[in-house]
């Protein structure tokens, strides 16, 4: 079998085809079902070019094709087969011109370079513009609720493969359902008249995959959604699982057991270009959003549709090709667009309480928009639950997106990459072995739905600001600042509550084969702001889990599991203590080691002892000065307004870290040489090495680096040790001194509250009227014709696949930032000048000369390295030596204090003279005062 490069345009002639631009049969009208598939095909005599979706997916394999048969290059677990996309060399059933070439004849240049702000304005216009001569349609309300089905554009419904169109009684592929939910998520129930279209198909839901978003751009959103659809395709096509294979054999395709929920946190912050992407695949439509229904404010706009289309991160349109076994399968999508920005916890309440209660899924997979699940990542998570009935939650490996190593040129990205890697190699496996993973990251994790019901979700949702009035003192209004910070890491609360659930024995697990990529902050200001929430939330949640450990005794865990949990609790307590004192320990390590080198090893890196002493002293002052600077910055400035000072701090601490590393290496070499010179056996030499002061340093360095290396090679993932470890070592002090200080100084910032939507105010409101029977409530709405819908859809596709040009996000300091900056500069100068004066007076003597003076009084035979010895000494000489340096310093300091006292006296005398002069003039004035 001949195998081809999967990224070439070479395909055998007999297997080439091109979807017709103008199908012989028109688009199906609403309510009718398309009698044909595929569209008329035009077979080319020459080679037809194809474009593969090769956007740098990590771990994705290739594919080869010859005479219509597909062969795996690798085995099924390691191979990712991506569907074909319509590229410049192929035609599209959607548009008569290539939508991917910006500035084409039917695509104005402005549309491909539209800014985000103009996209938002255009979005508002499309929601409110009236259509003249439109047909008026009456829509019945369901128990007073607005729930309506809308025809999808013809190209969307025409894209579905014929093999999925068996049910002629269903409009699943022809109509999209819109629900204007005017209730709280807890009240979104069939009893209250709210019923999802997906539940009407009477299908069991095995997997509910949720993607939560805030203001991510269309590239980030498409990256996540497209790779989720690839994962669903791989689940349905897998031959490794009897569960999914049996389901397909019984006539229940796997995709019918999977639902994708998209939850957007607010109409106002959402990138409107994302809505173009969703509209292209049929999950959204312009002009149907309702602000109010009979005076009841819409809380969420819910769209439901089953689509076989996708847009990848290029962005390019991905549509099925007849006979291609790598086509995407249909995906049931529920899009929940919240009217207001009410935070991620509220988005999860819509997911678990509104959608979950109706769908009753077995497993819920949580993803953040921008996270890119790898090949079979979702399948590996599901497999872990399927094979362990006591598994309540799981997470995969999240690693930094490094763009084939290009982003590692940024030291911040490299340092974070090392953090992610070592966490996945050391921390997560350890916690998984105990059965309690302290945090299942919300960006990529999964929960068994029945496991989180009850107290876990109840406690979790106490942090929802929209429930504050209902919960009273149990909500955020009754929480202290420490408890509020705990909910900044709400995923940690859910993890602990799940493991400690009364009468249950749920465990948490780390699933190594399940991998996902995520973007990491590339700027210092972004990293500082992100870690504030992480550090404060994780610290508060760690304290919470320690103080509530007794609740584990009410769970159903066995004695062996409880033993493991006790060991883990002790480990967590020690880790918490070390984290608390990290600031002091880092300073002590730095100050002791840089002084240890010239004192114990008698090595002066800067020539003489005097110069080395002063340079080390300056380094220590600089260290403390920038530490003090962090306190001033953190207490009064936003990181984005002080980018320059924060970047300077990172560079300074990186230099000091480099100096510390050099000193440590030299001390280690000296210790090894000393051990080799000592007599005795190898055991004695090792004992002398590790019992000495330098030996402890050697042991610490060897154990840390050695453990990192061995563990990385054990997991066959050592490359970060060479590409990211040096950057991490240089930035490690900044992670403690900068990030921790900023986090604790902003402990009060818990970012509660909701933000209203200005754009929602411009949406239309609807009011119902009674029918002639006086009971049925209906609303009147303009109905678009299929032709108008298809015509406007062309513009939607053009906007969706237009090259993305992000808006300039360089935020300029506002007036308040400028005022704070001036205050910060003034306070820093004030503190530094005072500190400089105090330190300079305390160190007027320079290098301590007491030791050589004392040694001069001792006999020449004295050798302190021989142990405790008794020698004859000159007591008077030693006394004078000890007093000499102190007297010398005292003499210099007395001069300074004399100057201070005389200056104080002079200033006081000036004030006194002024006082006397005023008194004299006042007394003398009485003589010539006129009455």
Swiss-Prot record:
Q: Where in the cell is it found?
A: Cell membrane
**Example GO molecular function:** chitin synthase activity
State the species of origin.
Cryptococcus neoformans var. grubii serotype A (strain H99 / ATCC 208821 / CBS 10515 / FGSC 9487) (Filobasidiella neoformans var. grubii)
Q: What does this protein do?
A: Polymerizes chitin, a structural polymer of the cell wall and septum, by transferring the sugar moiety of UDP-GlcNAc to the non-reducing end of the growing chitin polymer.
What Pfam family is a match for this entry? Chitin_synth_1
Knockout-associated phenotype: Decreases capsular diameter. Decreases extracellular vesicle secretion.
Q: Which reaction does it catalyse?
A: [(1->4)-N-acetyl-beta-D-glucosaminyl](n) + UDP-N-acetyl-alpha-D-glucosamine = [(1->4)-N-acetyl-beta-D-glucosaminyl](n+1) + UDP + H(+)
* Keyword terms, alphabetized: Cell membrane, Cell wall biogenesis/degradation, Glycoprotein, Glycosyltransferase, Membrane, Transferase, Transmembrane, Transmembrane helix
- Protein's name according to its UniProt entry: Chitin synthase 7
Question: What are the inducing conditions?
Answer: Induced by high temperature. Induced by the antifungal agent caspofungin.
| Skewed-composition ranges (Polar residues) | 7-28, 83-92
Kindly report the protein's main subcellular placement as a broad class.
Answer: membrane
Q: Where are the stretches annotated Disordered? A: 1-34, 56-92, 763-789
| GO biological process assignments | cell wall organization; chitin biosynthetic process
Q: What is its EC number?
A: 2.4.1.16
Name the family. Belongs to the chitin synthase family. Class III subfamily.
Indicate which residues are glycosylated according to the record: 536, 691, 819, 866, 874
């Amino acid at each position: 079998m001949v195998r081809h490069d999967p990224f070439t345009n070479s395909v055998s002639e007999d297997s080439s085809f091109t979807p017709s631009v103008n199908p012989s049969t028109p688009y199906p009208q609403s309510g009718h079902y398309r009698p044909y598939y595929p569209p008329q095909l035009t077979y080319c005599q020459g080679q037809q070019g194809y474009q593969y979706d090769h956007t740098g997916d990590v771990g994705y394999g290739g594919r080869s094709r010859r005479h219509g048969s597909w062969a795996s290059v690798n085995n099924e677990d390691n191979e990712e087969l991506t569907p074909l996309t319509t590229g410049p060399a192929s035609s599209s059933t959607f548009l008569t011109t290539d939508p991917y070439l910006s500035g084409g004849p039917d695509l104005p240049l402005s549309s491909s370079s539209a800014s985000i702000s103009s996209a938002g304005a255009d979005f508002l216009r499309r929601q409110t513009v009236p259509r003249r001569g439109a047909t008026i349609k009456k829509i019945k309300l369901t128990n007073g609720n607005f729930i309506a089905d809308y025809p999808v554009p013809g190209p969307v419904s025409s894209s579905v493969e014929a093999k999925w169109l068996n049910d002629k009684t269903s409009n699943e592929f022809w109509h999209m359902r819109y629900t204007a939910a005017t209730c709280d998520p807890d009240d979104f129930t069939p009893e209250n008249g709210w019923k999802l279209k997906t539940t009407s198909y009477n299908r069991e839901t095995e997997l509910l995959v949720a993607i939560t978003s805030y203001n991510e751009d269309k590239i980030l959103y498409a990256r996540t959604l497209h790779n989720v659809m690839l994962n669903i395709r791989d689940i349905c096509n897998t031959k490794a699982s009897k569960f999914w294979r049996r389901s397909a054999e019984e006539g229940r395709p796997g995709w019918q057991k999977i639902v994708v929920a998209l939850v957007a946190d607010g109409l106002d912050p959402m990138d409107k270009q994302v809505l173009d992407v969703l509209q292209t695949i049929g999950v959204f439509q312009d002009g149907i959003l309702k602000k109010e229904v009979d005076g009841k404010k819409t809380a969420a706009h819910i769209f439901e549709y089953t689509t076989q289309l996708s847009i990848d991160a290029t962005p390019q349109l991905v549509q099925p090709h007849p006979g291609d076994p790598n086509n995407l399968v249909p995906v049931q999508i529920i899009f929940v667009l919240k009217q207001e920005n009410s935070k991620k916890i509220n988005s999860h309440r819509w997911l678990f309480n509104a959608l979950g209660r109706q769908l009753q899924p077995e497993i819920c997979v949580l993803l953040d928009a921008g996270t890119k699940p790898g090949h079979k990542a979702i399948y590996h998570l599901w497999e872990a639950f399927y094979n362990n009935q006591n598994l309540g939650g799981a997470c995969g490996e999240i690693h930094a997106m490094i763009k084939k190593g290009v982003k590692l040129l940024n030291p911040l990205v490299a340092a974070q990459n090392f953090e992610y890697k070592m966490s996945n190699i050391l921390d997560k496996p350890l916690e998984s072995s105990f059965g309690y993973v302290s945090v299942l990251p919300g960006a990529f994790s999964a929960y068994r739905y029945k496991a989180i019901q009850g107290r876990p979700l109840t406690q979790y949702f106490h942090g929802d600001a929209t429930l504050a009035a209902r919960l009273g003192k149990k909500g955020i209004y009754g929480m202290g600042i420490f408890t509020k910070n705990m909910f900044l890491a709400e995923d940690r609360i859910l993890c602990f509550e799940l493991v400690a659930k009364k009468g249950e024995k749920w465990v948490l697990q780390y699933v190594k084969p399940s991998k996902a990529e995520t973007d990491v902050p590339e700027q210092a200001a972004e990293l500082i702001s992100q870690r504030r929430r992480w550090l404060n939330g994780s610290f508060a949640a760690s304290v919470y889990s320690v103080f509530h450990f007794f609740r584990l005794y009410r769970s159903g865990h066995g004695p062996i599991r409880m033993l493991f949990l006790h060991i883990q609790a002790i480990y967590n307590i020690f880790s918490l203590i070390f984290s608390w004192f990290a600031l002091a320990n880092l300073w002590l390590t730095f100050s002791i080691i840089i002084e240890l080198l010239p004192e114990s090893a008698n090595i002066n890196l800067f020539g003489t002892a005097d110069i080395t002493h002063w340079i080390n002293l300056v380094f220590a002052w600089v260290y403390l000065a920038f530490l003090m600077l962090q306190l001033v910055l953190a207490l009064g400035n936003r990181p984005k307004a002080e980018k320059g000072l924060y970047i300077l701090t990172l560079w300074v601490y990186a230099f000091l870290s480099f100096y510390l590393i050099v000193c440590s290496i030299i001390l280690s070499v000296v210790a090894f040489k000393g051990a080799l010179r000592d007599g005795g056996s190898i055991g004695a030499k090792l004992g002398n090495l590790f019992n000495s002061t330098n030996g402890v340093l050697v042991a610490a360095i060897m154990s840390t680096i050695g453990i990192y290396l061995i563990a990385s090679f054990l997991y066959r993932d050592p490359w970060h040790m060479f590409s990211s470890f040096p950057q991490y070592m240089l930035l490690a002090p900044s992670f403690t001194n900068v990030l921790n200080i900023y986090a604790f100084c902003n402990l009060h910032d818990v970012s509660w509250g909701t933000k209203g939507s200005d754009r929602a105010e411009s949406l239309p409101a609807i009011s119902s009227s009674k029918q002639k029977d006086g009971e049925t409530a209906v609303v009147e709405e303009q109905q678009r014709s299929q032709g108008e819908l298809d015509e406007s859809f062309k513009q939607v596709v053009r906007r969706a696949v237009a090259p993305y040009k992000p808006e300039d996000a360089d935020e300029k300091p506002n007036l308040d930032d400028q005022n704070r900056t001036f205050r910060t500069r003034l306070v820093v100068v004030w503190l530094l000048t005072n500190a400089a004066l105090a330190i300079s007076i305390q160190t007027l003597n320079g290098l301590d000369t007491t030791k050589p003076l004392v040694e001069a009084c001792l006999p020449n035979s004295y050798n302190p390295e021989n142990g405790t010895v008794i020698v004859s000494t000159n007591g008077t000489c030693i006394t004078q030596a000890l007093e000499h340096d102190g007297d010398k310093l005292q003499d210099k300091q007395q001069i300074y204090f004399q100057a201070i006292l005389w200056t104080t006296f002079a200033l006081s005398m000036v004030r006194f003279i002024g006082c006397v002069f005023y008194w004299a003039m006042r007394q003398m004035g009485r003589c010539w005062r006129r009455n």
